[in-house]
Design a protein with these regions (language model features):
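C-terminal, non-catalytic extensions of nucleic-acid polymerases
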Residues: 290, 494, 528-824
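Two-metal-ion RNase H-like nuclease active-site motif
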Residues: 2-11, 170, 366-368
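Helical catalytic core of nucleic-acid polymerases
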Residues: 179-181, 199-203, 337-499, 505-507, ...
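Conserved DEDDh/DEDDy metal-dependent 3′-5′ exonuclease domain
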Residues: 36-182
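Short catalytic/ligand-binding loop motif for oxyanion handling, primarily in non-cytosolic enzymes
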Residues: 15, 105-110, 177, 375-376, ...
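Intrinsically disordered, low-complexity coil/linker segments enriched for acidic/polar
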Residues: 26, 46-55, 431-434, 805-808, ...
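Short secondary-structure boundary/capping segments
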Residues: 20-22, 113-118, 244, 380-385, ...
Length: 824
């Protein structure tokens, strides 16, 4: 018998409704239900059809799915009532596994309250103990729960006597969407769901009998969205089940962050021998941190500008939690052709847009990432929260890092062996070999696959744990909280990465991008030996390991928005015989890395904005397909393609949302819901705009998309022509490719000498007398690194004349007039 369901609860002053749909509901039935419901929406929007027949068809489909809907309702005026309470209790005779959205903070609690109160209810649903109807009791708790927020269940005094007849899984919590306050409607838009509907009747209204159907129908839509979400995240759900089995910790109802915490806690408890209850509520608060007290003595630079930076950083004091700019850790400076930002989130370069193709510049575009940068940094700089034991914590970090690497390599090795055996099995089958030989090989292959999967799960679980540690240092609610750890790790690692950038630039190797734990360089053929020497020295000196990737193309808008095409893609693409979308997508997964606005799949916690634009940009930049062609033709690729032109907008409750349009020559205002989906339409067909009006300042009106005609598309309506304004989407592509205006460069506009890639920066040459200025030199031939005492404190000067080492702009101008060399 199926005991796993998706569910959702709706509560009004005189109505309690709950819908359950089996997790195993046949997808074909769901698809038919959606098709029927789309016809219902079309009728509601003016198309012809028999709505009552379609409602009956929907009811039959829900029955075929195994859906359950229970209603408790009373009309205080007419005396009519409905009480499905006994049916709800029958439903819970067997323990159920329920999955909801935000259910941990609401639906689960409301079910608990109902089940606990059931024993006091009469046949109509009145609570004999409190002299209230159960719907009123639930409504009061519902309002209190929403107002209170997370943790309302702790206020319920019956829990110690109550045994819950179900297990609740909250998919919002599992996917960490509760932390970003992502609503189910926002998720539905990202899932390209056909029906985006907010509550049909205000939550504080009394429900009439004729309204019950609309509430139930609305709730079915929400439950189906939740089911669609869970099915789309199958890999995440299965990962939690596998990690639970592998580590012996139940993480099935946890976000990735909580999984990491659970694994780390288990390991620290094991290595320290301290019971978790004795350290889970500990932390180290700090007010001020002197940066000089946390800097590594190994941080040294050869150039004046970076030595000045080091001194300035060392002299600074961080005020934890301060909102003042002067108290924060943030520095901007120019080095080489790049402008860098040091901040709490890591080192980043301020990258200009452009296209870089290795074959055209006759050089290698190489990305080097530091393996396990932050975990290794924690160990290298001896970082541990002051309130925890040093050695057990270091053992926890070391075990997590090393075991993850071992498990990752073991999984990869076994997978290769499995593939080899798989090919052998197929060869034997084709040659009609003895079945016993095939069976033996198959058994070995199955064992390898099982072992590889276990190692992969272990590696993934430990990766989650290790990635979380750094963030936990600055989470005031976590037992790893110690802000000093955060700054000790990030500041030292950023300066350490700058050491690599410096030695590369001093060898004439251009660094064109830096992002947290890696850098991208342009390397001429004659520079390969120098590049290797620089990287080898840096790895040995800092005890870090670099991982290298060569790119055929590096196409970027900025540091966080780019397409990186790995070496070998074009050759693999040319050899691809069957260039189906599926085959190309598989190839792209192997060779292409996208970030930011070039990712076509929109994250649930991000605003939904026209996926057709990144699709058009990708096809243009990778396959030379004119972006205008994609914008105009994609709409004909499928019935669902209209979603790729849509934009979403969620507005605050303090605003009224109005769709203002011209209908038959007259101004027409239609009130919209808080979450809306729309697309840009041809003004000659549909002249309308979405405006938001501040309830407290009615005269203050803002348009959602200025200077454009928009058409709401909350309900999917199939049309032969949606009258899309293609020019809007083409302009969005053009802004990225050619710049928003004359002052803002685009990717294509600076294609020539990208990033000054082949230019010489003489001011980056080491000074001739390092001892005189308190700098140091690196001799790569004998690996002899000598450090000189720091020079006198000099503040950072980011002006052009300051970078060249002049004390004033006048001195710099005189040097130019005299024809002096502008070296350090």
């Amino acid at each position: 018998m199926n005991n796993a369901y998706e569910y959702d609860v709706e509560i009004y002053p005189n109505l309690f409704e709950v819908t359950f749909i089996p997790k195993t509901a046949d997808q074909k039935l769901i698809d038919v239900y959606k098709a029927v419901d789309i016809r219902c929406l079309a009728i509601k929007n003016g198309k012809e059809g028999n709505l009552e027949e379609l409602k009956e068809a929907k009811a039959k489909l829900l029955l075929a799915m195994g859906a359950k809907q229970f209603v408790i309702w009373i009309d205080y005026t007419t005396g009519k009532w409905r009480n499905d309470g006994p049916l709800i209790m029958d439903f819970f005779i067997q323990h159920k596994i329920l999955t909801g959205y935000n259910s941990n903070n609401y639906d689960k609690i409301m079910l608990d309250i109902f089940i606990n109160n059931y024993k006091y209810l009469d046949v109509k649903g009145f609570n004999k103990k409190e002299s209230k109807h159960i719907t009123q009791i639930l409504y009061d708790h519902s309002c209190a729960c929403v107002d209170f927020g997370k943790g309302y269940s702790r206020l319920l005094n019956f829990k110690k006597y109550y045994k819950r007849p179900f297990t609740d899984y909250d998919i919002q919590k599992i996917l960490y969407l509760d932390k970003t306050y992502t609503s189910l409607k926002q998720v539905a838009i990202c899932l390209k769901w056909y029906r985006i509907q907010n509550l049909p009747i205000a939550y504080n209204c009394r429900i009439r009998e004729e309204d019950i159907y609309d509430i139930c129908d609305y709730n079915v839509n929400d439950v189906l969205i939740t089911l669609e979400l869970e099915r789309s995240q199958k890999a995440e759900i299965e990962l939690r089940e596998d990690i639970s089995e592998e580590f012996g910790i139940d993480v099935r109802n946890m976000s990735r962050s909580s999984i990491g915490k659970a694994i780390t806690t288990s390991l620290y408890e094991k290595f320290s021998g301290i019971d978790r209850k004795d350290f889970m509520d500990t932390k180290t608060d700090r007010w001020k941190i002197k940066v000089s007290s946390i800097l590594s003595p190994k941080l040294k630079f050869q150039t004046k500008i970076l030595n000045d930076l080091l001194r300035t950083v060392a002299q600074s004091t961080i005020v934890v939690g301060s909102t003042k700019d002067e108290d924060k850790f943030k520095y901007e400076f120019q080095f080489g052709d790049a402008v860098y930002t040091m901040a709490l989130g890591g080192l980043h370069s301020q990258d200009k847009p452009g296209l870089l193709i290795a074959s055209e510049i006759g050089a290698c575009i190489r990305d080097c990432d530091v393996a396990s940068f932050y975990p290794n940094g924690i160990l290298s700089y001896d970082v541990y929260p002051e309130h925890l034991e040093r050695n057990p914590f270091r053992a926890t970090v070391g075990y997590t890092k090393d075991t993850r690497v071992e498990a990752k390599h073991a999984a990869s090795k076994e997978l290769k062996e499995y593939k080899k055996l798989f090919n052998e099995i197929n060869t034997f089958k084709n040659n009609h070999a003895n079945q016993s030989i095939i069976d033996d090989l198959q058994a070995k292959a199955d064992a390898l696959m099982k072992s590889s999967k276990r190692h992969k799960i272990k590696a993934e679980g430990l990766k989650i744990a290790i990635n979380r540690m750094y963030g936990a240092f600055r989470d005031i609610n976590d037992y790893l909280y110690d802000p000093k750890c955060t700054y000790k790790v990030t500041i030292n690692l950023q300066l350490c990465l700058l050491m690599l950038i410096e030695v590369l630039e001093l060898k004439g190797i251009k660094v064109i991008s830096a992002n947290t734990d890696g850098i991208i360089c342009i390397i001429k053929p004659e520079q390969e030996a120098d590049y290797k020497a620089c990287c080898d020295w840096w790895q040995e000196y800092n005890n870090f390991e670099l991982e290298f990737t060569n790119y055929e193309k590096y196409l970027r808008n900025d540091v966080n928005n780019y397409i990186a095409v790995k070496e070998g893609f074009q050759d693999a693409y040319d050899k691809l015989i069957d260039k189906t979308p599926e085959a190309i997508a598989e190839l792209e997964d192997i060779y292409i890395k996208r970030k930011g606005l070039f990712i076509e799949t929109i994250a649930f916690n991000k605003g939904y904005a026209y996926p057709v634009v990144p699709k058009a940009l990708n096809l243009f930049l990778l396959y030379n397909v004119p972006y205008a062609d994609t914008i105009e033709n994609h709409i004909h690729s499928s019935k669902e393609a209209i979603y790729d032109y849509c934009i979403s907008q969620k507005t605050d409750a303090k605003f009224n949302i109005i769709y203002r349009s011209i209908v038959n020559g007259e101004l027409h205002n239609e009130e919209l819901q808080k979450s809306n989906r729309f697309y840009i339409s041809d003004v000659s067909y549909c002249s309308g705009t979405i405006i938001k009006i501040d309830k407290n300042k009615p005269s203050k009106i803002n348009r959602i998309v200025a200077k454009c005609s928009v058409r709401p598309f909350n309900d999917y309506i199939e049309e032969d022509d949606y009258h899309i304004d293609f020019s809007y989407y083409k302009k969005e592509c053009a802004k990225i490719l050619y710049g928003k205006n004359k002052k803002t460069a685009g990717m294509v506009a600076v294609q020539g000498d990208l990033f000054g890639a082949m230019s010489n920066n003489k001011h980056l040459e080491p000074i001739e007398s390092p001892e005189e200025d308190g700098l140091f030199e690196v001799d790569f031939e004998d690996d002899n690194v000598s450090f000189i005492n720091p020079a006198n404190d000099i503040p950072i000067n980011n002006t052009i004349w300051g970078m060249y080492g002049f004390s004033s702009e006048e001195e710099y101008k005189r040097a130019i007039e005299n024809g002096d060399d502008l070296t350090f």
